[in-house]
């Protein structure tokens, strides 16, 4: 029972220490939040994302005019292959050559993100760049080159463009609000951890209860601080 009370008193003291230094914690959090805001706004260069989407159906040109269940099922399995084709070395090299980009195929691949929504045959191609017009230009060129490559390799009848890439109006990164919030919370957590750490390392006797807990003896009396009584 005594040990349980000691734990409760210790926890209370830790909370009290945090509350006592709440102004310092708030100031540090505001400084780190402002630093994150300034870094995201003035140092990090914004990037823009343009996305184009294609629809591919595994349909053979033959006597059957419509789509069969087998065609649809095969198309679902092949979309992962399409993603690999889009990011293949041949496709990237052709895009770099056509647009005369000052990039290597590997550098271009780092700007590209290919996603395939679950249970669909739709492929989304997103390109990031610091210039919004350049991002859309690369995305549309990549779509055209990849479409021809997909048709020649997989023998599908057609690759349909669902959506052309357009220049983005607002940047996709950095997320200034999120970064500022992370900076603020990091300041709060970091300062709180330091305060708690210093409090736990402080072995000085500050209260009469500390003597009882340390020596396991009942305190008979306390000498008053005469300076505070004046």
Curated annotation (Swiss-Prot):
Membrane-crossing segments per the record: 24-44, 181-201
Role this protein plays: Required for CpsD phosphorylation. Involved in the regulation of capsular polysaccharide biosynthesis. May be part of a complex that directs the coordinated polymerization and export to the cell surface of the capsular polysaccharide.
Biological source species: Streptococcus pneumoniae serotype 4 (strain ATCC BAA-334 / TIGR4)
Pfam families: Wzz
Family as reported in the entry's similarity comment: Belongs to the CpsC/CapA family.
One example GO MF annotation: carbohydrate:proton symporter activity
PANTHER family (alphabetical): FERRIC ENTEROBACTIN TRANSPORT PROTEIN FEPE, TYROSINE-PROTEIN KINASE
Membrane topology: Multi-pass membrane protein
Protein name stated in the entry: Capsular polysaccharide biosynthesis protein CpsC
Highest taxon, organism lineage: Bacteria
GO biological process terms, semicolon-separated: capsule polysaccharide biosynthetic process; polysaccharide transport
Keywords: Capsule biogenesis/degradation, Cell membrane, Exopolysaccharide synthesis, Membrane, Transmembrane, Transmembrane helix
Pathway: Capsule biogenesis; capsule polysaccharide biosynthesis
Subcellular location: Cell membrane
Lineage: Bacteria, Bacillati, Bacillota, Bacilli, Lactobacillales
Keyword Cell membrane: yes
Entry keyword Transmembrane: yes
């Amino acid at each position: 029972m005594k040990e349980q009370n000691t734990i409760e008193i210790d926890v209370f003291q830790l909370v009290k220490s945090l509350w006592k230094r709440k102004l310092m914690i708030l100031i540090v959090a505001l400084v780190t939040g402002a630093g994150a805001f300034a870094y995201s706004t003035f140092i990090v260069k914004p990037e823009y994302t343009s996305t184009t989407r294609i629809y591919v159906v595994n349909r053979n040109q033959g006597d059957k005019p419509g789509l069969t269940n087998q065609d649809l099922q095969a198309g679902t399995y092949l979309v992962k292959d399409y993603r690999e084709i889009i990011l293949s070395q041949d496709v990237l090299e052709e895009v770099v050559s056509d647009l005369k980009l000052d990039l290597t195929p590997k550098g271009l691949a780092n700007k590209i993100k290919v996603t395939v929504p679950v249970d669909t045959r739709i492929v989304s191609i997103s390109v990031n760049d610091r210039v919004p017009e350049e991002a859309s230009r690369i995305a549309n060129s990549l779509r055209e080159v990849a479409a021809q490559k997909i048709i020649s390799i997989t023998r599908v009848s057609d690759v349909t463009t669902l959506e052309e890439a357009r220049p983005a109006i607002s940047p996709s990164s950095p997320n200034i609000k999120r970064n500022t919030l992370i900076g603020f919370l990091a300041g709060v957590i970091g300062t709180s951890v330091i305060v708690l750490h210093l409090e736990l390392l402080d072995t000085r006797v500050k209260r009469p209860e500390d003597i009882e807990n340390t020596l396991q003896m009942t305190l008979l009396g306390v000498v008053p601080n005469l300076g505070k009584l004046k």
